[in-house]
A protein has these predicted regions:
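Short recognition patches in nucleic-acid-associated and regulatory proteins
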Residues: 2-4, 11-16, 22-68, 87
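Short cysteine-rich clusters marking metal-coordination/redox-active sites
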Residues: 16-20, 75-78
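Short, compact, well-ordered microdomains
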Residues: 62-98
């Protein structure tokens, strides 16, 4: 993980905007992908404000073979909308912005 993704303080780590490096990111939407390894279908849950959608599609899963998460943000500093991707592969968990 690079210093570009997190800003470390004494007791916590702050997520940094990949565009302006600001730390004022607001979460507004979440996608959860849950499936058996390499399965074509699984559970796909989208929480967007007060709306919740559940389906079996793995389209948009940031992980090619396993579970994945997407957290959508808006940034106060530059008004961009970065998406944090959380994926796993062979026991390792990866964080990256899209």
């Amino acid at each position: 993980m690079t210093g570009d993704l997190l800003l470390s303080t004494s007791f916590e780590h702050l997520l940094c905007c990949p565009h302006c490096k600001g730390t004022y990111l607001h979460q507004y939407k979440y996608e959860i992908f849950d499936r058996a390894e390499d399965a074509r279908e699984g559970n796909h849950v989208v929480v967007d404000g007060s709306n919740v959608t559940i389906n079996r599609s793995m389209e948009g899963n940031p992980s090619a073979r396993r579970d994945g998460l997407k957290i959508y943000f808006t940034c106060e500093g530059c008004e961009e909308n970065p998406t944090l991707l959380i994926t796993q592969h062979k026991g390792q968990t990866f964080l990256q912005f899209q």
